């Protein structure tokens, strides 16, 4: 994978709190459908209330026992996953045509950013070509799900910081029965700062690096403001 050369695209970053999944999904769709070749790219950093999402390739049988947790069928690639408190979710609305990126390279760059983020904690993450995401000793620590429309991507990644992993026992994570799932909090020494703020800051820095954004062209919208389309 070649790291992107610096470019002059404006990037808008929103660090949000807990956002309803359907609200974020509709907003991503609206921005992607209405953006122009001159529109800035966007990255949203947030978390969701507990929810299962089933991608376009998802099968109901992988929802083994959803219980009272809502299930939403969505337009991203991939199978079933869980989102909830304790995750760092990053949604990427990027103009791939402007960057000259294909889908495979997009996935590889996101995975590289996650792996580099884990490296700050002394955690060795790896990617698997047959199952997108990032893994530590065979257990999944980050999931990817993307959609490309009109040459632009949306959706993104979910990195497990310190969530209750019990919800993953109710599904076949990403469509793989028996897949183990892990989190940063279980892989670092006691007392390590694994706050969401720290993980988000590290992840954002690595995303800027792998996609070649000029830090001077990054604009933050504020701590809790939800951007309009």
Where are these predicted regions, by residue range?
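Short, conserved beta-strand/beta-arch hydrophobic-aromatic motifs that form part
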Residues: 56-63, 144-161, 165-166
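N-terminal lobe of the biotin/lipoate ligase/transferase fold
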Residues: 1-141, 170, 190-197, 224-229
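C-terminal accessory segment of soluble enzyme catalytic cores
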Residues: 154, 166-229
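A structural signal for short, well-ordered beta-strand segments
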Residues: 90-92, 132, 144-146, 157-161, ...
């Amino acid at each position: 994978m070649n790291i992107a050369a610096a470019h002059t695209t404006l990037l808008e970053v929103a660090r949000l709190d807990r956002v309803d999944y359907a609200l974020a999904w509709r907003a991503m769709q609206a921005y992607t459908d209405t953006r122009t070749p001159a529109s800035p790219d966007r990255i949203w950093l947030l978390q969701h209330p507990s929810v299962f999402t089933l991608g376009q390739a998802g099968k109901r049988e992988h929802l083994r026992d959803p219980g009272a947790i809502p299930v939403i069928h969505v337009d991203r690639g991939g199978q079933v996953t869980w989102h909830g408190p304790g995750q760092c979710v990053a949604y990427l609305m990027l103009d791939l045509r402007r960057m000259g990126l294909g889908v495979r390279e997009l996935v590889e760059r996101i995975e590289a950013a996650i792996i580099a983020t884990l490296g700050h904690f002394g955690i060795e993450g790896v990617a698997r070509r047959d199952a997108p995401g990032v893994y530590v000793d065979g257990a999944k620590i980050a999931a990817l799900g993307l959609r490309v429309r009109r040459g632009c991507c949306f959706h993104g990644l979910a990195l497990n910081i310190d969530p209750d992993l019990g919800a993953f026992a109710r599904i076949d994570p990403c469509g793989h029965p028996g897949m183990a799932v892990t989190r940063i909090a279980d892989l670092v020494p006691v007392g390590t700062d694994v706050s969401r703020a720290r993980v988000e800051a590290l992840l954002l820095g690595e995303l800027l690096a792998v996609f070649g954004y000029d830090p001077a062209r990054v604009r933050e919208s504020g701590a809790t403001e939800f951007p309009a389309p």
